């Protein structure tokens, strides 16, 4: 119980600290660029046309809504984080209880030791089920978080309170409105998890020497590196999910010119791929203007 409480508190603290970062990231993902590009230099010293980074973008938001405005959407995101942690823990706890029941039921019969690969498959499958359950239950809060952020673009106040936002979505879109963008989000999470754990297994098994004294440390490093690599590869799923969550919801940021009305998440994916925007919002620093794009001052976006 104390373990779960500490996880919730730690997660909530990290959520609060990272809220301004997520706010900026979401607005960039939608395509909103309130500040014109400037001429700067990249890491190799070459002159490039750069878009404002995280700090300039955050400063712009604070100049309009104050520093408190940087924490728009925090309440539903905290609810999502707390509920997700609890659900994730409960699902894993259920699997642990099932294992104990099997062990006690088998009596003194010696269980066959499973291979490390089988163990990875088993643990990854359980983690996938736990994450999927948490994502499914918390997605409505995720949708509200995104929409409350995106309304900054049109200066709307449609999604302000948690209860009012729930009522608005249900009234206008029904139950399905709470799960806009769920499928690409689930797919991205699942692919990222399996990719991360599979790569970590291969690295730990075939690339690292088991005789090294710091083996456990090396394994934790490899897990972190493969996790970062997997998240980079599956970023398009995150982008598509977030865009579908705000698409055609009555906000300026979810309608043309910032986004066409997508018929499905696959349509959104194809459109982004065609425009070369699959990595939009992936980087918050050293953001250069993509080749062939120009900045439109009136629309505050790249066209």
Swiss-Prot record:
Q: Where in the cell is it found?
A: Mitochondrion outer membrane
The yes or no answer to whether the keyword Protein biosynthesis is present is no
Q: From its record, what is one biological process in GO terms?
A: hematopoietic stem cell homeostasis
Enumerate the Pfam families for this protein: Mito_carr
**Does the UniProt entry include the keyword NAD?**
no
UniProt topology in membrane: Multi-pass membrane protein
The Solcar repeats are found at 2-98, 118-206
Q: Which residues carry this modification: N-acetylalanine?
A: 2
Mind listing the UniProt keywords for this protein, alphabetically? Acetylation, Membrane, Mitochondrion, Mitochondrion outer membrane, Repeat, Transmembrane, Transmembrane helix
InterPro entries according to UniProt: Mitochondrial_sb/sol_carrier, Mt_carrier_dom_sf
GO molecular function list:
membrane insertase activity
* Top-level division of the source organism's lineage: Eukaryota
Can you tell me where the transmembrane regions are? 16-36, 78-92, 136-156, 181-199, 232-252, 281-303
Give residue ranges on the Mitochondrial intermembrane side. Answer: 2-15, 93-135, 200-231
User: Could you list which ranges are Cytoplasmic topological domains?
Assistant: 37-77, 157-180, 253-280
* CC per GO annotation: membrane; mitochondrial outer membrane; mitochondrion
Give the record's family classification: Belongs to the mitochondrial carrier (TC 2.A.29) family.
The protein's assembly and partners: Interacts with p15BID.
The UniProt function text for this chain reads:
Protein insertase that mediates insertion of transmembrane proteins into the mitochondrial outer membrane. Catalyzes insertion of proteins with alpha-helical transmembrane regions, such as signal-anchored, tail-anchored and multi-pass membrane proteins. Does not mediate insertion of beta-barrel transmembrane proteins. Also acts as a receptor for the truncated form of pro-apoptotic BH3-interacting domain death agonist (p15 BID) and has therefore a critical function in apoptosis. Regulates the quiescence/cycling of hematopoietic stem cells (HSCs).
Record's protein name: Mitochondrial carrier homolog 2
- State the organism named in the record: Bos taurus
Taxonomic lineage of the native organism: Eukaryota, Metazoa, Chordata, Craniata, Vertebrata
């Amino acid at each position: 119980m104390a373990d779960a409480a500490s996880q919730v508190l730690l997660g909530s603290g990290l959520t609060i600290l990272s809220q301004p970062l997520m706010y900026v990231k979401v607005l960039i993902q939608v395509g909103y660029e309130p500040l014109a590009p400037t001429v700067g230099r990249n890491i190799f010293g070459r002159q490039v046309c750069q878009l404002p980074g995280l700090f300039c973008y955050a400063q712009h938001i604070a100049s309009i809504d104050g520093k408190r405005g940087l924490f728009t959407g925090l309440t539903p995101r905290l609810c999502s984080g707390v509920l997700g942690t609890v659900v994730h823990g409960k699902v894993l706890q259920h699997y642990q209880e099932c294992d104990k029941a099997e062990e006690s039921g088998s009596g003194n019969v010696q269980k066959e030791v499973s291979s490390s690969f089988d163990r990875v498959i088993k643990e990854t499958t359980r983690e996938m089920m736990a994450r999927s359950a948490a994502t499914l239950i918390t997605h409505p809060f995720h949708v509200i978080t995104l929409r409350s952020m995106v309304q900054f673009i049109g200066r709307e106040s449609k999604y302000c309170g948690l209860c009012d936002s729930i009522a608005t979505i249900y009234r206008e879109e029904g139950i399905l409105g709470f799960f806009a963008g769920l499928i690409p989000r689930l797919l991205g999470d699942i692919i990222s998890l399996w990719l991360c754990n599979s790569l970590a297994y291969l690295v730990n098994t075939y690339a690292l020497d088991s005789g090294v004294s710091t083996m456990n440390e090396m394994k934790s490093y490899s897990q972190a590196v493969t996790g970062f690599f997997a998240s980079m590869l599956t970023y398009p799923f995150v982008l598509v999910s977030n865009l579908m969550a705000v698409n055609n919801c009555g906000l300026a940021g979810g309608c043309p010119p910032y986004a066409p009305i997508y018929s499905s998440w696959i349509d959104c994916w194809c459109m982004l791929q065609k425009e070369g925007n699959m990595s939009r919002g992936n980087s918050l620093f050293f953001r250069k203007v993509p080749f062939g794009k120009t900045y439109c001052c009136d629309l505050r976006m790249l066209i």
